[in-house]
Amino acid sequence: MKNITVLGVTGSIGTQTIDVVLGHPDEFKIVAMSAGHNIKKLEEIMSQLPVAHICVLEQADYDYLTEKYPDRHFYLGQEGLIQISTLEETEIVLNAIVGFAGLLPTIEAIKAGKDIALANKETLVVAGHIIIPLAKEYNIQLLPVDSEHSAIFQSMHGEYPREISKILLTCSGGSFRDKSLNELKDATVEQALNHPNWSMGAKITIDSATLVNKGLEVMEAKWLFDVDYDDIEVLIHPESVVHSMIECTDTAVIGQLGTPDMRLPIQYALTYPHRIPLMNSKRLSLSDIGTLHFYKPDTIRFKALPLAYRAGRAGGSMPCVFNGANEEANQLFRDGKIKFLEIVDLIEDAMNAHNVVENPTLDELIKIDADARAFVRKRVGL
């Protein structure tokens, strides 16, 4: 029985984690969880699982839940996230919080000796230079939940790091992979949220449409697997069957294949190094699929990808600016305040205006993130 804290339990990754846990009640126990604004969904989960420790974002929600459920322990805000991430009984923290907000709980959980199942890629994008040394210092396991990074992690089993020459990061292409640049000018939120393969939250689905998500994954892969940016290649793979691959020095290519089901990488992060059956899952039939396609991304239509490589190579505080500007612009697009193509334009503008801080501290990163968001809002007159 493994004791788990789930951060971001009402989101897409969080609810799929619940599905994994309910499928294996003898393997997993959720001892703590957090939610943002979806209190109705949180209460549904509370009715399914007797989770003792629960953190919420808003004071009003905290007051409501404390009164309604006197037998549960409730926590509030950022401090509450840290408290439930460092509980003595917690063995592994699955961090599925969206965005920069997931950083501090990850840091404190590592310091408390907890293994981390990381779905919050922004943590490594923004602060990989802090997280990776901390993970080594406290001798914890940092396990990827992103399907691509889980695939790379699985493909590396039995290989010596020095014998891996390249990472091949696959990409569905998002909602607009077949749209022209002209068609993208008036793309709507509804169109962007219609992902062809994966069921995900709104923010990451928009990020997939801009290819910002793949850019974030490139930066995450650099930190997770200690590879140079020149050795990370992105391939558009519309079928989302090959979740990513590695190329070895002898030219062998090793990959992980499967149906597009996020529960698989979630479950593997929780059971590593073992495997157990994935309940209610569909097995991959290559004969039914027949043909798999791979091609290079169009970096003129989707300039977020070269911008991400630029941010990663610049290093220091630049990935924080890339991420912060994107989080703000992504939200503005979902709120109907900017057009689709403006998202990446605003990221580029924020990067161009930024002077890189070489080795930013946590406090500096918090300020840089806030400044990038403020820059974007000011740029659009807000």
Where are the language model's segments positioned?
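Catalytic, metal-anchored helix/loop core of enzyme active sites in primary metabolism
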Residues: 1-382
